[in-house]
Design a protein with these regions (language model features):
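Conserved alpha/beta-domain cores
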Residues: 92, 519, 529-876
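C-terminal accessory/binding modules appended to enzymatic or scaffolding proteins
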Residues: 12-15, 399-443, 810-827
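Nucleotide/phosphate-binding sheet-loop regions of phosphoryl- and nucleotidyl-transfer enzymes
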Residues: 1-389, 415, 424-427, 434-439, ...
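Short beta->alpha connector loops at strand-helix junctions that form conserved
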Residues: 40, 450-452, 471-474, 562, ...
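Intrinsically disordered, low-complexity regulatory segments
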Residues: 475-476, 524-527, 543-545
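Long, charged amphipathic helices and adjacent flexible linkers at domain junctions
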Residues: 66, 224-229, 365-420, 424-426, ...
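Glycine-rich phosphate/ribose-binding loops and adjacent secondary-structure elements
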Residues: 330-332, 434-442, 446-448, 454-461, ...
Length: 876
């Protein structure tokens, strides 16, 4: 018989895939002799089984759960559902990868109308007993039955107003009894006449099912897609004996880190609340005290906590994020995990752990999430602009960086206006965030909350995303329905600008200018270690000297893709290029190309100078010509005047360039076949620039000329012959013996299939995975967004094939092309220059496929360097 349930004493940290992160760590802590409320874990396999059986828990799994409850009753000397001294449990989810705020917790399960009376007598604390029951009704209704939390919050606010009190803790036992009656009425109404369940076994099974269901709720799916977590992992369920932090002033609950998760500084960092339950801190409902206050309130608990926290860090050799509860002076740990941290903190902690002798440089490189380096290059406020800024409030600096943008009050509005929507800069202002807000948080430049501490949902999720966040600004008076808030004597409505400093917690009026960040010395150490271990080269995709310098500063070893068409769009250039496009004879085109050639040459010279001898792959003209022709009336008239044509003639010529499917039309090398004079002009510009810079600066330059969109060997040979003829003519004129290479972009499936033939003519391959993905899947990058969401929801695809290389299809073409190309030309250099070149999982694939380098946008160069090192270490 399969084992679906494990006691904490039966597992260990290595059983993470089966027990989930939380369950495996609780088992490990039990083995370490830590004070853990005992319990058991229902495995991730049971979750998979639940989905396999049409969202039903099998009899076998249910029997094992009740058997484990029997053991827990024996262990605690209490009975589940007892009317005198009931066993109460918490039910928490725990996936293999940490998914903060994604899955929901239920506390005090096992209480009912009768048990609560016995519980009040047994504890001698009626207020505590009824508070525990009202919390359970609220959580069970919200998490299990999806009755909105706001219904209950509204009743609490009404009762507090009636009684003339401010805090929940000021409500008496009788007030809480009144709440319970009203809560159950809300439940009954929402559940269409069904009463709140009184049988603890029914409560438990419904809660377990709810955790399994929550694995597939929309916000969990979004989080998984954003963090590369496979959908088939499933979640475990942890059932744990309740301990109570809300029993009075010698009880409390808190969350703490062994190092600062924002900066990485060594030392306990955290918060706690006296007389509260765990979710109060994490959910950010009340704003807590710093952990140092615990030393004054409960000194013995504090010293025991400090000692055990260090024991955990030394055991796991990493910063720990711990949840704890103190029940009447006795300390319990509810969980520990490797803490989520900012990229800045990750680097600081990794370097410190190496210096402390706890880990090796190789382990340090593996500790840092490559994708998170994005955050390090976060903007900061311009110093002068900041001096003029008006501080209107200050709260907790929950996630670093600087952000300025328009105020929005809902996640929907943030999604509509922000990143991925209209692309405007928005700041999401909320009373408190909840997991439903995750997509809106992702679309925002910054997040500002009224409630919640440094460990609230908003803080943890924002740090993970690298989004600036300021939390717990109690000075704000917010009206979410009217979409306005008041702070510092000002009223702000939707669309007004504010600025946030997530490193100091300061809130400013207006739109303060931001500047790019500078990186610290420890960043250099990590990058030096990464460069030592990686096998893949890292280049950049850049078309301007400024981008090139930036990429070189961030460690790029050259340019893997210089898109020459971007050089034609300058205000003084585009009219000349349009003139060339609309010229109707070769002679006129050659004439029109002369000034354009000079522009290109000047640009290439500036690029070669910025590269200081590093290689550059120049891609010849790729987009269809219609992309360059004018669409505005004024531009059409100017072009007509310039060429001595009528407006109608210009419009007719532009119309003639129109294509039904331009991305598969007259573009790439097809332009060079039709208009060889364009390839000649570009060759002359590249060769003259390279020769002049190598002579002036003494750099050794070998131009790499890349012909795009080749699908046939003879097509490449035709363009190559044109290039060689012009290149040799330039060498002769300049009396130069400079060497150059001619290669191609592999972006048409046919080219990948015939790579052995194409390699007879090409000296290098660069995989243009954007087009290769479009043509292999048969859908357009610009239109796929309209239907891909349905594909994710239906679990047809787990990730966007344009962001994450499709290893099963497109990846096979890449592997085949590399292998077959090298059969023809063993020293064939192969790289990748699509957007995938900056994605860590795609980089690991490139390492395994035997590519020589990846090329990505300048700001992703550090990510690629680190990901390449991690791929080399993981696959050695």
């Amino acid at each position: 018989m399969a084992k679906w349930v494990y006691r904490f004493s039966e597992g260990n940290a290595s059983m993470r895939p089966l027990l989930g992160g939380k369950g495996a760590n609780l088992a490990e802590m039990t083995g370490l002799g830590m004070p853990i409320p005992q319990g058991f874990t229902v495995t991730t396999e049971a979750c998979t089984e639940y989905y396999r059986h049409g969202k039903q828990i099998t009899d076998e799994i249910q029997a094992q759960i009740f058997e484990a409850i029997g053991w827990l009753e024996e262990y605690n000397g209490k009975k589940f559902g007892d009317t005198q001294d009931p066993l109460l449990v918490s039910v928490r989810s725990g996936a293999r990868a940490s998914m903060p705020g994604m899955m929901d917790t239920i506390l005090n399960l096992g209480l009912n109308d009768v048990a609560v009376e016995g519980f009040a007598v047994k504890t001698g604390n009626p207020r505590f007993a009824y508070d525990s029951y009202r919390r359970f009704i609220q959580m069970f209704s919200d998490v299990v039955m999806e009755v909105p939390k706001s219904y209950f919050e509204k009743i609490i606010d009404e009762v507090k107003a009636d009684k003339g009190v401010v805090y929940d803790t000021e409500l008496t036992a009788d007030d809480l009894k009144e709440l319970i009656v009203r809560f159950k009425a809300v439940y009954k109404e929402a559940m269409k006449g069904e009463e709140f369940p009184q049988d603890p076994k029914v409560q438990l099974m419904e809660a377990v099912k709810a955790v399994f269901r929550s694995w597939d709720n929309p916000r969990a799916i979004v989080y998984r897609r954003m963090n590369d977590i496979p959908g088939d992992w499933g979640t475990a369920v942890n059932v744990q004996t309740m301990v109570f932090g809300n029993k009075g002033d010698t009880s409390g609950t808190g969350v703490a880190f062994t190092r600062n998760p924002s900066t990485g500084a060594k030392g306990i960092y955290g918060e706690y609340l006296i007389n509260a339950q765990g979710e109060d801190v994490v959910a950010g409902v009340r704003t807590p005290q710093p952990i140092t206050q615990l030393e004054k309130d409960l000194p013995e608990c504090y010293s025991q906590f400090m000692e055990l926290a260090m024991k955990l860090e030394n055991h796991y050799k990493d910063m720990q994020d711990m949840e704890f509860t103190i029940e009447e002076g006795k300390l319990y740990f509810l969980q520990t995990r490797n803490g989520k941290r900012t990229a800045q903190a990750a680097i600081q902690i990794a370097c410190d752990l190496v210096d402390e002798g706890m880990i090796t440089p190789k382990e340090a490189v593996m500790r840092i999430e490559a994708k998170s380096l994005d955050q390090l290059l976060h903007p900061m406020f311009d110093t002068d602009a900041l001096k003029a800024g008006e501080v209107i409030g200050e709260a907790l600096p929950a996630s670093p960086g600087a952000a300025a943008g328009k105020v929005v009050f809902t996640a929907e509005e943030a999604k509509k206006l922000g990143k991925g929507g209209k692309g405007e800069r928005v700041i999401l202002v909320r009373l408190e965030t909840s997991p439903e807000d995750i997509e809106g948080m992702h679309a925002s430049q910054g997040i500002l909350t009224v409630r919640g501490g440094m460990t609230s949902h908003a803080a943890v999720v924002a740090r993970g995303m690298g989004t600036c966040c300021v939390s717990g600004c109690g000075a704000i008076s917010i009206d979410e329905e009217a979409k306005q808030f008041t702070l510092g004597g000002y009223i702000f409505t939707e669309g007004d600008y504010i600025s946030l400093d997530g490193s100091t917690g300061k809130i400013y009026k207006g739109d303060i200018k931001t500047v790019e960040a500078t990186v610290s010395g420890n960043f250099g150490r990590i990058m030096a270690w990464a460069d030592e271990y990686r096998k893949l080269g890292v280049r950049t995709n850049a078309d301007t000297p400024a981008d090139t310098k930036n990429a070189v500063r961030l460690g790029a070893e050259g340019i893997g893709l210089c898109r020459t068409e971007h050089m034609f769009f300058g205000e003084d250039r585009i009219p000349k290029f349009r003139r060339m496009i609309l010229s109707d004879t070769v002679e006129k085109r050659v004439e029109a190309l002369k000034p354009i050639g000079e522009f290109q040459k000047a640009d290439f010279k500036a690029m070669y100078e910025a590269l200081e001898g590093r290689p550059m792959t120049v891609r010849y003209l790729d987009p269809p010509l219609h992309e360059f022709v004018p669409t505005e009336e004024e531009d059409i008239k100017a072009l007509a005047d310039d060429m001595g044509l009528t407006v109608e003639e210009v419009k007719a010529k532009c119309e003639a360039l129109h294509e039904f499917n331009p991305m598969m039309g007259h573009r790439g090398c097809r332009l060079a076949v039709t208009y060889p004079e364009i390839a000649r002009m570009q060759t002359r510009a590249v060769m003259e620039a390279a020769i002049e810079v190598s002579e002036e600066k003494g750099y050794e330059i070998t131009p790499e000329i890349m012909i795009p969109l080749v699908g046939e060997k003879k097509e490449l040979k035709f363009v190559k012959d044109v290039v060689i003829e012009e290149a040799e003519a330039v060498k002769k004129e300049k009396n130069s013996d400079i060497r150059y290479k001619i290669g191609t972009m592999i972006e048409i499936p046919r080219a990948a299939l015939l790579a052995n033939e194409i390699a007879e003519e090409a000296e290098f391959f660069s995989f243009g995975t954007n087009d290769l993905t479009q043509m292999t899947f048969g859908f357009s990058r610009d239109d796929a967004g309209k239907f891909l969401d349905s594909y994710y929801k239906s679990k047809i695809y787990e990730s966007d094939p344009f962001a994450r290389l499709d290893q099963n299809g497109v990846g096979q073409l890449v592997k085949m092309a590399v292998a077959n190309g090298r059969k023809t030309r063993p020293a064939l250099k192969c790289g990748i220059c699509g957007e995938h070149g900056g994605d860590p999982l795609s980089i690991e694939f490139c390492h395994k496929a035997g590519l020589d380098y990846v090329s990505c946008s300048p700001f992703r160069v550090p990510i690629a360097r680190l990901a390449a090192a991690q791929a080399a270490i993981a696959n050695r």
